Amino acid sequence: MERLEKQFFIIPTLQLATALLGKTFVRILPGNRVLKGRIVETEAYLGEGDEASHAWRGKTDRNAPMFEAPGTLYVYFVYGCHHLVNIVSEPRETAGAVLLRAMEPLEGQGFMERQRGTASASDLMSGPAKIAQALDINRSHSGSDLFSGEFFLENAPRIPENQIGTSSRIGISRGRELQWRKFVIGSPHLSQGQPS
């Protein structure tokens, strides 16, 4: 399958949140073990003006990868126990990233099940913290890019517009009016149900 190149990621964050749906996220572990998940849910986060974003007050040591080149991974730690995985989207020094909220496991499910402690396919990657745990991603991977080999995205047919849902972002206290969550309608792997 064709790997996505840098040009794919050089689009506005809100567009990337939609464009990522259906694409395959790949992690190559030591020993060439392959893990794959189909992206079925995302959320867009900008910088200045987006109070739900880590970068809305500017650049810090913690959020610095969010200001890197498009296609960079931004991984952060929350609640003292969870890692969340984002893909940087805006030009360098302009904050923007897409949070990977849910995936459908495609390859390496045995490893993912051991990582997660569950054999439920619909629950393996049905949330941003579950994705990081299933793929064994942590803060040490923040700043990695999607072009050097350990991580990359594979192309897949574009999801038709009538199969893409939109809602407000989940688990935030500010910016809830913004409809910046995107998801594949009907997927059993979503982090939360679809809005009625």
Swiss-Prot record:
Keywords: DNA damage, DNA repair, Hydrolase. GO terms for molecular function: alkylbase DNA N-glycosylase activity; DNA binding. Its EC number is 3.2.2.-. The keyword S-adenosyl-L-methionine does not apply. Disulfide bonds: none annotated. SUPFAM superfamilies: FMT C-terminal domain-like. The keyword Iron-sulfur does not apply. InterPro entries: Formyl_transferase-like_C_sf, MPG, MPG_sf. GO terms for biological process: base-excision repair. Belongs to the DNA glycosylase MPG family. This is Putative 3-methyladenine DNA glycosylase. It comes from Chlorobium phaeovibrioides (strain DSM 265 / 1930).
